[in-house]
Design a protein with these regions (language model features):
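Bacterial Sec-dependent N-terminal signal peptides
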Residues: 1-29
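Membrane-proximal, proline-rich intrinsically disordered regions
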Residues: 20-67
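Short, surface-exposed recognition loops and adjoining beta-strand edges that mediate ligand/DNA contacts
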Residues: 34, 61-80, 160-163, 200-219, ...
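Conserved, well-structured interaction surfaces
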Residues: 40, 44-57, 81-154, 175-186, ...
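Elongated scaffold/linker segments in the mid-to-C-terminal portions of large proteins
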Residues: 41-42, 47, 51-60, 73, ...
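Alpha-helical solenoid scaffolds that mediate protein-protein interactions
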Residues: 117-121, 150-151, 195, 242, ...
Length: 486
């Protein structure tokens, strides 16, 4: 079969990324591999397609693999929705009959196209050296990122580093044994090294922060070596590599925390100074977060029943200016998170969760449950409901700081600077400085943590970092991996 269908290229027409360099080309699903790769523009378009394929195939799966099995969810939806199987994640009752995710989260579809990009880019003489190396840096980084998800979720998985092309397909040898997790980790580290080498000294976000970059590779390197150090016996040597990578990112990534926590996720503040790599959503290609239906049908309450509830001021939700949510909520955040996961003064509470109350005839309010309030989308002109055109963060600078704190703590060093940078932003400088004896590391202790099912005081540095990661990364697909790593 000589003609090879490049199916992922159909994504190109959908990828006029806002704020990201893009190339408007018609879909080329009918173009054969032999007739493609004839110009620099075709390499550019294929690279756009790779990022679009990761977004369309796996954005929701990245969340599912990294969060619902943790301690964030598990209550019954207060609105009465049927959970339709997603409760198996929080109850950890997935099995051979209900795996939760099929086909390895569709990652191998994207991997095959990455492998093709690597091969053709290495072979070509159509690209200048800098452009060629940048594409290779992105491709090797993306491949390592995907295999890191596969490793953490499945352990032993099939390794494939060459594209499956029809002209090379041997149908008598389609089966391939899974490789041990140790070999998967070796490949991940090898690809990270290849990505770093290809990027060289180029730390730029050349095509925007919805494309892979050297800062993204350094973030991944820090995370990978912390995992291998703690989970796979790498120990001090791996912690040192992680620390060095994260300090390199800190010094050269041109990053800083946003002044306000809510600004990080604002629809009108995309690709801000804190973002490193995000999955883009935008009006221009009509792609909403998690392909819209996965977000809207899992995380958003129905308008009809919200008419019977109010906020903490007693204002009915349907009378709140700008409140126009409409969906289904199958992932119910545990009720106690609103009460026990954030200290007084922490702005991340209201930037993450919204409390739902029932107002009784005597005017008293009864707390019912929290809803997701980190990603708020936007209301388009002429629409009567919100559209989730928010970018979905994969890596951001607060994550880098807390990973660096973790590496330092594991090496017996003082992580106060990194932890307190995140906390100061969370509380605001004025409140933080006035209450350092209560909220600055290592002072966040006391009765708040008595019988707290989610967090502990600062007496243990690892508990302090894990606590900060919970408060910072709700809904960003990290908690399950964090619990396992710690």
């Amino acid at each position: 079969m000589k003609k090879i269908i490049i199916a992922m290229m159909a994504a190109v027409s959908l990828l006029n990324f806002s704020g990201c360099d893009s190339l408007d080309m018609e879909p080329v699903s009918s173009i054969s591999d032999a007739n493609y790769w004839k110009s620099p523009d075709q390499f550019k378009a294929f690279n756009i397609g790779l990022h679009g394929l990761l977004r369309s195939q796996s954005s929701y799966n990245i969340f599912v693999l990294g969060e619902p099995r943790s301690d964030i969810y598990g209550d019954q939806p207060f609105g009465g929705e049927a959970t339709q199987g997603v409760e198996r994640f929080s109850y950890n009752t997935i099995n051979a009959e209900f795996t939760g995710i099929s086909n390895f989260a569709n990652f191998y579809t994207t991997l095959n196209q990455i492998n093709l990009m690597i091969r053709r880019t290495n072979e070509t003489d159509l690209l200048g050296e800098a452009e060629k190396n940048y594409y290779l840096g992105q491709a090797y980084g993306l491949r390592a990122y995907i295999y890191f998800h596969l490793l953490r979720s499945w352990g032993d998985v099939i390794i494939t580093t060459e594209p499956t092309l029809g002209s090379e397909l041997d149908i008598s040898h389609l089966d391939k044994a899974a490789s041990p997790a140790s070999e998967v980790m070796d490949l991940i580290k090898k690809d990270i090294d290849a990505s770093e080498k290809a990027f060289g000294g180029d730390y730029s976000y050349k095509q925007g922060k919805c494309y892979w970059s050297k800062p993204a590779t350094l973030m991944l390197k820090g995370e990978v070596y912390l995992w291998s150090g703690r989970q796979m016996g790498g120990g001090t040597g791996d912690y040192t590599v992680a620390k060095t990578a994260l300090q390199d990112l800190q010094q050269n990534g041109n990053l800083k925390l946003q002044e306000k926590f809510t600004d990080v996720f604002s629809f009108n503040n995309k690709e801000n100074s804190e973002m490193i790599f995000a999955l883009h959503s935008g009006k221009e290609d009509d792609f909403m977060m998690w392909r819209d239906y996965n977000w809207r049908n899992n995380m958003v309450p129905q308008r009809e029943y919200m008419a019977g509830y109010c906020d903490e001021t007693g204002t009915p939700f349907l009378e709140i200016p700008g409140y126009n949510l409409q969906g289904l909520m199958r992932y119910q955040v545990k009720k106690d998170h609103y009460l026990k996961s954030f200290r007084e003064g922490d702005t991340r509470l209201k930037g993450t969760l919204k409390a739902v109350y029932k107002k009784h005839e005597d005017g008293t309010l009864e707390y019912i449950a929290p809803i997701q309030y980190k990603f708020q989308g936007t209301t388009l002109e002429g629409s009567n409901e919100r559209s989730w055109y928010d970018d979905y963060p994969i890596y951001r600078y607060a994550d880098a700081l807390l990973l660096l704190a973790e590496a330092k703590a594991l090496l017996g060093e003082d992580p106060s600077t990194e932890i307190n940078a995140v906390r100061e932003r969370a509380y605001g400088s004025e409140y933080f400085n006035a209450h350092k004896n209560e909220v600055a590391y290592p002072n966040d202790k006391g009765s708040f943590y008595n019988d707290n099912p989610f967090e502990a005081g600062d007496e243990n540095v690892m508990e302090a970092i894990l606590k900060e990661r919970l408060r910072e990364f709700f809904f960003e697909g990290k908690r399950w991996y964090d619990l396992r790593r710690f």
